[in-house]
Amino acid sequence: RTHKMTQTKVEAPFVANNAHFKNLIINGDFKNWQRATAATAFSNGNYTTADRWKNLISTDGVLKSERYSMSLADQATTGQGYAYKITVTTADTSIGASQYALIHQPIEAQNLQHLKYGTSSAETLTLSFWAKATTQESTASDAKFSVTLNKPDSTAYFLTKEYSFDAHDTWKKFEITFSPTEGSTTLITNSAGAITNDTGVGLHLYFAFGNGSNFTGAANTWTSDGDYASTNQHNLLANTSNNWYITGVQLEVGDQATDFEHLPHDVQLQRCQRYYQKLSGAY
């Protein structure tokens, strides 16, 4: 008998990101909502609904967030059972210079030491997510949205990227890369770019919905300007018929996105409970 041997090529990104807990985001599939699942108004600086996703708002409008249960068609497209839904219940058609509306996830610093920020070996990160939106006052492609990575330790640095949709109310997958030298800068690879090894916040990931001129700036370059959105940021609060959905959020090392990491529910819940645990009086 003869035995034939075959050789299979395994792509480098698969090998590099095949470890457990590759996703730096906790509850990126929005399965855990210890505080509330029903529509709840944004409260500045607070967690109101989905675990690990904090609200930041200072506008004349009102945003609400809630858990959205995906249809079978949604699941077939995104591979996810839930999404984070934002609706506008009070409009603000003119965002003031010092006003803002965002959600963000703070990522614990001691879990980020492998990024090697503050050195010439700093790692590239890739963000992937599914999202959809409706913007009544604009075509889908003209409505630019912003997502920002912020390193707060020592000197705070910000890197904003833009994204837009092809059609209203249609799921689209986004893959966005954050290079440590984006914009030909050395802010992250110098010592001031380091992330302190402690239990504080090492990185923030922000999604913007309406920011005034004091909090907007150039995209695609690291800055220290304190900008949470680009100057092209669309104002989601302009119309009470507007909405925005997101699910499958993953931030990982490397310059390519890999498949979303589905963790067991009990594991993901325990990760959320490190920061907040709701106890029931019933036994």
Stretches with model-predicted labels:
Residues R1-K4:
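Short, Lys/Arg-enriched N-terminal segments with co-localized hydrophobic residues
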